[in-house]
Amino acid sequence: STPLVLRSITRHKGYVKGNGTLSYKDVVPIAGVIGDYGAIAVAKSSPFKNFKDVVDAYNKDPNSVKMAGGSVRGSMDHLIGALAFQAAGADPNAVAYIPYDAGGKALAGLLSGETQIISTGLGELMGARDQVRIIGITAPSRVSDAPDAPTLKEQGYDVQFVNWRGFFGPPGMSNSDKSKIAKMLGDVQKTPEWETVRARNAWVNIYNPEGKFVSFLEKQTEEMTALMKKLGVI
């Protein structure tokens, strides 16, 4: 059987930062499949009702706002929050970011009061909406699967960002196998079962097969390099 690897922008950033030994060029890009917008949320009991409330509290006392994320500094979780604070005029590197080793642990940190906000993927929060209030997402407009989640853009913070996930094959994979799997992934996205999973996680379909996926990855490398330099991560 042909082994496959599912990758996301989080893994891709290791190469962009220069601390990874492999990039998409070392494997065979098959297809990009979904996008997951970033989200900032607070506990339901939080006094923060929107992102402006967070910014106001931070400007008054920077030590009063700690941001949880389910991965290390420089990861997608960190970048989402950093971009939001930067758009609000704050120094993104001065915001206290508390990294946890999983999204669930970051959520637990938020709910326990260890942190005041969480920066993560929207899909990560969809199953916890009875416990958290989503106060900003990085989509260009509200998404139908989470209509009550306001965008950062509509609140005056022009932050648009989407994490992606795609499939890669091993070096030497034949073109016929690559095309066959790419077609299969495209067909899967047309099924009602896929739609159920997609809607549950508020993902967006970004099917990019083969050559289109390579072009997408080339553009992502350029954009992520510029973004991480801008934020001082690299």
Residue ranges and their predicted role:
Residues 175-234:
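An extracytoplasmic/periplasmic, membrane-proximal ligand-sensing/linker region
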Residues 1-165:
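Conserved hydrophobic/amphipathic secondary-structure segments
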Residues 49, 105, 147, 172-177, ...:
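Residue-level signal for the nucleotide or nucleotide-sugar donor/cofactor binding architecture
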Residues 95-100, 168-169, 211-216:
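Short linear loop/turn motifs
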